[in-house]
Structure formats: C-alpha cells, structure tokens
C-alpha cells in the first residue's frame, strides 16, 4: 500500500534511486496504490549524469509492495521492498532496463513493454 509521502526505490536505470509519492492517480479521493497503479512522485535521490535529476516530478508505476495483495486464485503476493518504475506520458518505461521481479498484475493493467523488460514476473 503506497500513499502520499511513501518513499519507493526505483527499479530501473533512469538515474533515480529513490522517489517520494506526491499523489495516487485514479480518483479524487483515492488514498492507496498497489501493484500496477500509477502515482505522481518527486525524485529524492539520483545519481549524477542520469536522465532524471533530484527534484524532478515524474509519473511512476508501482511494481513491488511490502503489503501483501490477494490474487483471484486465493494466493497472496508480497515483496521485501516498495519499488516503482518511472514512465513516460504514454505509459512506456523511461529507462531501458528493469531490476528485480515485478508483479503479474502489470500484465492485467496492460504494461506490456514493462513486462518484456522485466527479468522475472511473479
């Protein structure tokens, strides 16, 4: 469960290392984001010479959450960290690589380019 002020690791090679959630998209009073949801965030930590700089406002899709999520078959999925991938306005990833596994929920939400770059889909 990601909400305002949540900090997430960045799981791509855009140059950002950590982002802070400013807003959860998808409704005026939407409070939480899960795997596959889009958030607006600001870059809190970045490496020098990266595509994004500290202070940039970006859109990102959540790919891993610590809070467990129930799937339609009754199983649960949870990860060791909260992580997101920075995306362009057309919902394609901004980086060219993705690090670590991503949730299967991304396929249901039609993030196919992101799925193809991911090393593992759980």
From Swiss-Prot:
| Record CDD domains | Ribosomal_uL14
What the entry lists under SUPFAM superfamilies is as follows: Ribosomal protein L14 (SSF50193)
GO molecular-function terms, A-Z: large ribosomal subunit rRNA binding; structural constituent of ribosome
A GO biological process held by the record? translation
**Positions in coiled-coil regions:** none
UniProt KW Mitochondrion keyword: no
Q: What is any one of the record's Gene Ontology cellular component terms?
A: cytosolic large ribosomal subunit
Q: Which UniProt keywords apply?
A: Ribonucleoprotein, Ribosomal protein, RNA-binding, rRNA-binding
Is Ribonucleoprotein found in the keyword set? yes
Stated family: Belongs to the universal ribosomal protein uL14 family.
Q: What does this protein do?
A: Binds to 23S rRNA. Forms part of two intersubunit bridges in the 70S ribosome.
Kindly give the PANTHER family that the UniProt entry links to this protein: 50S/60S RIBOSOMAL PROTEIN L14/L23, LARGE RIBOSOMAL SUBUNIT PROTEIN UL14M
Q: How does it assemble?
A: Part of the 50S ribosomal subunit. Forms a cluster with proteins L3 and L19. In the 70S ribosome, L14 and L19 interact and together make contacts with the 16S rRNA in bridges B5 and B8.
Identification of the protein by name: Large ribosomal subunit protein uL14
């Amino acid at each position: 469960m990601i909400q305002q002020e949540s900090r997430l690791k960045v799981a791509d090679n855009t140059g950002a290392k950590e982002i802070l959630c400013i807003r959860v998209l998808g409704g005026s009073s939407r409070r939480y984001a899960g795997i596959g949801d889009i958030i607006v965030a600001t870059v809190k930590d970045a490496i020098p010479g990266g595509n994004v700089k500290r202070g940039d406002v970006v859109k990102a899709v959540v790919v891993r959450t610590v809070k467990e999520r129930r799937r339609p078959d009754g199983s649960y999925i949870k990860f060791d960290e909260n992580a997101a991938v920075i995306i362009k306005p057309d919902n394609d990833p901004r980086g060219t690589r993705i690090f670590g596994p991503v949730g299967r929920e991304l396929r249901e939400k039609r993030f196919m380019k992101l799925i193809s770059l991911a090393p593992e889909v759980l």
